[in-house]
């Protein structure tokens, strides 16, 4: 090989190693595609951030004149608004701390052997919850309902309600006092115009278990309705609350009281002569009382 052939070969190799136009265009396309992908990712990221900021701006109240704000100042406003909401929550919890008090701190239940003025103090047990007047009023009605029944009521109130609610505190206190005694109602007081005899309470209640069961059912339903209304008025969600009330009536053997009894026809005539009434009116009056007593005995 001569020197001329060697030079031609070297020149051909140099030209073959030089980049062509097609190669340069392909490289440009690759660089442009990488840049476009990067810009699309960045654009999606920025759009998500802007959407989140816009949702925050919609939640937090702002002035209409303050439409243009930088993100740092807006984030500071978000933090301040969160602190404001926390203060509100703390104020609400402080005002309702009485639901968390233990039942032992309540006023003890008074005995029913006192005067009527002492009986009026019963609603104070629930009135200690001073922030909820509706519950206090409804609990006073519950006590009036209990006092309308003469025999002892062994109440077992089983509730499934949220913790720290006002009714849970009252029901737990009632469970700690199972042997509550109530005032004898005026309906059971004797009528002096027909004479009186002393008898025990077990003479009023018959041995028929159906009668006592029906009376217990009526009283339980009445207390349950009142308790449900009290819960609704106090704001308790009844769809998440399950309440059951069961009252059991029992006879009493430790106390006597007077019950109106029959008077003889001669006694009726003497009473009629003293009061200026006819014997027929006196007998009819005694018969009415006897009829009412028979209805009670049933």
From Swiss-Prot:
Keyword Transcription regulation: yes
Keyword Translocase attributed: no
Annotated Pfam families: HLH
GO terms for biological process, alphabetical: DNA-templated transcription; regulation of DNA-templated transcription
InterPro entries: bHLH_dom (IPR011598), BIM1/2/3 (IPR044295), HLH_DNA-bd_sf (IPR036638)
Subcellular location: Nucleus
UniProt GO cellular component terms: nucleus
Quaternary structure note: Homodimer. Interacts with the N-terminus of BZR2/BES1.
Alphabetical list of PANTHER family matching this protein: BES1-INTERACTING MYC-LIKE PROTEIN (PTHR46412), TRANSCRIPTION FACTOR BIM3 (PTHR46412:SF9)
Name under which the protein is recorded: Transcription factor BIM3
Organism: Arabidopsis thaliana
The gene coding this protein: BIM3
């Amino acid at each position: 090989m001569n020197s001329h052939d060697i030079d031609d070969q070297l020149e051909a190799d140099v030209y073959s190693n030089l980049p062509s136009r097609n190669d340069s265009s392909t490289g440009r396309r690759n660089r442009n595609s990488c840049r476009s992908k990067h810009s699309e990712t960045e654009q999606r990221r920025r759009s998500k951030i802007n959407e989140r900021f816009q949702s925050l701006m919609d939640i937090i109240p702002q002035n209409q004149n303050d439409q243009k704000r930088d993100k740092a100042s807006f984030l500071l406003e978000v933090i301040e608004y969160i602190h404001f909401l926390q203060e509100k929550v703390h104020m609400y919890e402080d005002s309702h701390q009485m639901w968390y008090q233990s039942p032992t701190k309540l006023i003890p239940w008074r005995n029913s052997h006192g005067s009527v003025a002492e009986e009026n103090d019963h609603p104070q047990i629930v009135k200690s919850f001073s922030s909820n007047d509706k519950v206090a009023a409804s609990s006073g009605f519950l006590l009036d309902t209990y006092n309308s029944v003469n025999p002892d009521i062994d109440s077992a109130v089983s509730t499934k309600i949220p913790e720290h609610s006002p009714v849970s505190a009252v029901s737990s206190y009632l469970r700690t006092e199972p042997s509550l005694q109530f005032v004898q109602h005026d309906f059971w007081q004797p009528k002096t115009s027909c004479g009186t005899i002393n008898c025990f309470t077990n003479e009023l209640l018959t041995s028929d278990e159906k009668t006592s069961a029906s009376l217990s059912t009526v009283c339980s339903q009445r207390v349950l309705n009142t308790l449900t209304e009290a819960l609704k008025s106090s704001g308790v969600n009844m769809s998440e609350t399950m309440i059951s009330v069961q009252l059991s009536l029992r006879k009493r053997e430790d106390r006597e009281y007077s019950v109106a009894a029959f008077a003889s026809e001669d006694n009726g005539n003497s009473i009629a002569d003293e009061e200026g009434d006819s014997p027929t009116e006196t007998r009819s009056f005694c018969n009415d009382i006897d009829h009412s007593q028979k209805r009670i005995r049933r």
